[in-house]
Amino acid sequence: EVGSLSVSLNTMLTRIEESFHAQAETTEKMKQFVSDASHELRTPLAAIHGYAELYKMQRDMPGALERADESIEHIEASSARMTVLVEDLLSLARLDEGRGIDITQQVPLTSVVRDAADDLHALDPDRGIRCGLIAIKPGTDLEHPSDFTFQDGDMPAITLTGDASRLRQVVTNIVGNIHRYTPADSPVEISMGVLPASISPESLSRMPANERSMHHLVEAIEVGQSMQVGMNYAIVRFSDHGPGVPPEARSKIFERFYTADPSRARQKGGTGLGMAIAQSVVKAHHGFICASGSEGGGLTLTVVLPVAPVEPRPAPEAETRKADKKGRKTKK
C-alpha cells in the first residue's frame, strides 16, 4: 500500500510540474507575442507620424503640393499595412479563444484549391502551374524513405466538414506567399487527394510541424492503405521552386511574426502572421500543416485535414457466412 501510494504521489507531482512548465511556457509565448505585436504596430505608426510631420514642415515651401501627394501616398501605404496587421492580430486572438470559426459546414475543398490556383495565375501570368494528384512513392532504402509524389491527372472532387472561409484563408495565405517570395515565372505544382492513415485526428493535430512528423505521417498512410484502417485524410500540397527556406528554419515559419527577411517581408506586404493563422485554422480542424523542401529546390507546404473514418474491410468469415446464407435462400 505504501509503495502504491508513493507511485501515485510521484505521478501526481510529475503532472503538477509539467502543468507549471506548460503554464510558464504559455506565459512566455504570450509576453513575446505582445512584445512583437507592439513592435510591428509601431513601425507603420512611426511612418505615418513621420510623413505627417514632414508635410507640416514643407507645406509653405515651393512645390509643397507635389511633396504633399508623396507624403499622403506613404501615409496611405502605412495605414493599409497597419489595417492588415490589426485584422490578422484579431483573427489570431479569436482563433486562440476558439471563436470566429465554424467547422460544421460542408466545404468543397477542390473548388477552394482551384480558385487559389486561378488567383495565382492571374497574379503571375508567366508562372507555370500544374495541378494533379497526390500519391505515395515507395522508399528504396533508409536514406530514401517513402514520400509524397506528384502525379498528372485531374484533381479529385473532395468535400469535407469544416469552415469554408477559414480554409479558403489558409489556401490564400499559402498562395500569397508563393506570389510574394518566389520569382513570377518559377513553376508551381499543386496536388491533392484522399489517403487513409492509421493515426487519429487528435494525434495528428498534436504533431510538431517538422519533417520527422511528415515521415511519421507517410508511414501511417502506408499502414492505412495496406490494412484499410484509420481515418481518410484530404491532403493538399503546394510546391514552389523559389529560393526556399533552410531546413533548420522551416518549422519556424509557423511562429508568429517570423520572417526570414523582415525588411523584404514589409516591402512585399507580409505581416509575418499568415502561416501562424494557417496553422491555427488547420489545428482547429484537427489537421496538420508542415513545410518541407521541394524536389529540385524550393518550398513545399502540406496541409492534411480529416474527412471520414475508413470503411473497414469485411472479415473473410463474414463474407463466407453471407455467401452461405445467400446459397441456402436460393435452394429454398
Predicted regions and their residues:
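Membrane-proximal coiled-coil signaling linkers
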Residues: 14-59, 71
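Short alpha-helical segment of the dimerization/phosphotransfer core of two-component systems
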Residues: 21, 77-82
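Conserved micro-motifs of the catalytic ATP-binding
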Residues: 97-103, 142, 155-162
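Short helix N-cap motif at coil->helix boundaries in the Bergerat
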Residues: 109, 244-255
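Short helix-loop "hinge" at the ATP-lid/N-box region of the Bergerat-fold HATPase_c
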Residues: 178-179
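Short beta-strand/loop element within the Bergerat-fold HATPase_c
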Residues: 185-199, 222-231
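Glycine-rich ATP-binding loops of the HATPase_c
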Residues: 286-292
